[in-house]
Amino acid sequence: MTAGVGPDLATASGAAGVRGWSPQRMWSVAGAVVLVACVWGFYAWDGAQTTAVLGGTVRAATLLVLGAMCGMIGERSGIVNIGIEGQFLMSAFTAFTVASMSGSLFLGVVAGVSTGLAMGWMLAAMSVGLRTDQIIAGTVLNIAALGLTSFFYDRGRSLGQPKYQSIELGPLADLPVVGTALFNRPPLTYLALVLVVVLHVLLLRSVWGMRTTAIGEHPGAAATVGIDVIRLRYWNVTLAGGLAGLGGAYLALESVGTFTRAMSGGRGFLALAVMIFGRRTPLGAYAAALFFGFTTALQGQFQLNDTFDIPAQFVGMLPFVVTIIVVAAAGLFGRMRDPAALGQPYEVR
């Protein structure tokens, strides 16, 4: 009799655990299952195209997650950053320019990251120091970056060398379906993945992460226990700009291999959607970035193959339409609470 109760209890416990899931978690799991099933189905139908789509997914997701991490550090600190688009664009320009003039991709990356840090500091100076409206401050960065890069853009300039090439990670690169897409990538892609894991641990497990959360939720209370709110917000927003700068360098030197006007193409705003859908956590943002990257890669594959005879304008809208649907669904099935002090300037008393 007792032996027969065990499986029933286990089944009941498992069912209760599933029933305890939030709607958003259930939809996320269901979406992941459907996505994996679609990938395997496509692979069985056409392995070469599936590998190309998965490679494009990782390539697009890398830029998005770098922008999302930039945004989440700022928002966890209480600062809204809609200037990621401008940080991407300006950093891509300086990275490409320095790399083409010096002949060194590494110096190009350093220039891109430095530009991101400088723009992060400017955002901090306007939002934290001058207590300017944070939306306006981010908009200023976007407009300035677009204007400056368009003015100084040299159509005839080329990189003068191959962009960053892929590095195989031994036998892992030979795995079916995911081997080439995940384990045969250029170096900045691997660096971005390492940063995702490191930042996730730091934000959720370190003293710095707890202090960052504190100044984004209750800056006044944080100040009473000795946290310098102004200084930490300055540091966080500036360092977050470095992540966007790395994203710009990645875009110019690894993903595309050149610079063109307005080449960020709205990806900074997509990164904000990725951050929201990933619930302001790096691992969650990377999962969301893979989803959005998949739609971007699918869009590119449709345009290359012209499989379904869909007008190019409608295909180009795909990532942004998916963004609207996903963000709306996230709000419908369990809206995430913003940090209590998000967007509010802090004054020392």
Predicted regions and their residues:
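Short, non-helical or kinked segments that cap or interrupt transmembrane helices
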Residues: 73-94, 128-141, 211, 235, ...
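Cytosolic-side transmembrane-helix boundaries in multi-pass membrane proteins
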Residues: 1-38, 217, 224-231, 302-349
